[in-house]
From Swiss-Prot:
Annotated keywords: Endoplasmic reticulum, Heme, Iron, Lipid metabolism, Membrane, Metal-binding, Microsome, Monooxygenase, Oxidoreductase, Transmembrane, Transmembrane helix
GO cellular component terms listed in the entry, alphabetical order: cytoplasm; endoplasmic reticulum membrane; intracellular membrane-bounded organelle
This protein's name: Cytochrome P450 2J4
Residues at which heme binds: C447
Source organism superkingdom: Eukaryota
Amino acid sequence: MLATAGSLIATIWAALHLRTLLVAALTFLLLADYFKTRRPKNYPPGPWGLPFVGNIFQLDFGQPHLSIQPFVKKYGNIFSLNLGDITSVVITGLPLIKETFTHIEQNILNRPLSVMQERITNKNGLIFSSGQTWKEQRRFALMTLRNFGLGKKSLEQRMQEEAHYLVEAIREEKGKPFNPHFSINNAVSNIICSVTFGERFEYHDSRFQEMLRLLDEVMYLETTMISQLYNIFPWIMKYIPGSHQTVFRNWEKLKLFVSSMIDDHRKDWNPEEPRDFIDAFLKEMSKYPEKTTSFNEENLICSTLDLFFAGTETTSTTLRWALLYMALYPEVQEKVQAEIDRVIGQKRAASLADRESMPYTNAVIHEVQRMGNIIPLNVPREVAMDTTLNGFHLPKGTMVLTNLTALHRDPKEWATPDVFNPEHFLENGQFKKRESFLPFSMGKRACLGEQLARSELFIFFTSLMQKFTFKPPTNEKLSLKFRNGLTLSPVTHRICAVPRE
């Protein structure tokens, strides 16, 4: 009897001891989270969040750029959010955006990294690097893009040739409904591939199509709720299956693809006659064998992938939006085609020199970019040193998000902000630049491929409008609904390309 009682007391004591330990551990974690995420003095206001996850569950990850807009109304043009253990501020409105990217830009040149992004890139490449690595890689990429045709007739001719291949690929659909996603992806990607890899890929190349599919999947899965939970609880989530694991597997396959291309280049590499970005990078690596710079194998792979991603996804997505808007706004499409027929006709290819004579087509492309809004919160920046913005204190390490969604739909800036209206970019029949139009961001970390993207958009869009009229399939309703990922892209759809001849 006494033994039984003793055993019971021991069990109760052990349970109480375990509970005490759990309570103590939880209290410690809560206090640690509080001190880590508490708002410093004069910090921008914002909604209170939950321990550990912050404001994550107050955002709709299907449309985070829209779910933050009520906070603008409540807290003003600068407010704070806690995204897990990442403290961030969101800036809204043209005056504040200009102040941020002019007066204090030197203090926010760094790139914040989620746990997932750091594991993928190890702080290498063009997009997610900071400091000296970013400076070296960006300077080299800009120089190399210029050396291999950016702004020159040779690259324009490649665009014209690729536009011809795309037209022929779409012509094979014979006006029947088809999904334009990967044919457009392939065409756009071939331009940057000609610069990075020194070659283009056929539209039926199964290996390259697989790379495009992997890239598309990464773009989408990196922003899912499960992936965000990995960023908050990596020590737990690394053992749990989910979209984050697919991202890591896909990224490794993409790295292997680029590595194989690099190996092929090494077989017949001539440092005196570089053929493309990879050759030029290998030459730069040979200058610094002691690895005293960022020119190493890992950065070669990451920078090549960054060019591949940035040179494919953004322009391709914009073109897909453009075809969708043309099918939904046939009166706009007719005006574009009338301008093409008047300036170019049907017997020659579109050239960049035509752009000045085609204000309406140029305005339509810009309006597609405004409404498509493919990078709605800009690519984030990180505060590199304690900074003051608009009277508020931003501590080192704060992530800065730019509310391009609100800017591109601001009723103070646009006559009909929520309506597709090319007249926003026209004045007295001539094309008009708009200060409140920032699809490529601004400042020192603005898109380094802006000139290339603008050229591609004009050549590809004009070439497609010259040869086809795009229409919704019979008995199928087209929608402007989007799929959220690293970019906002149209939901999967089919469209008809009816030959104009």
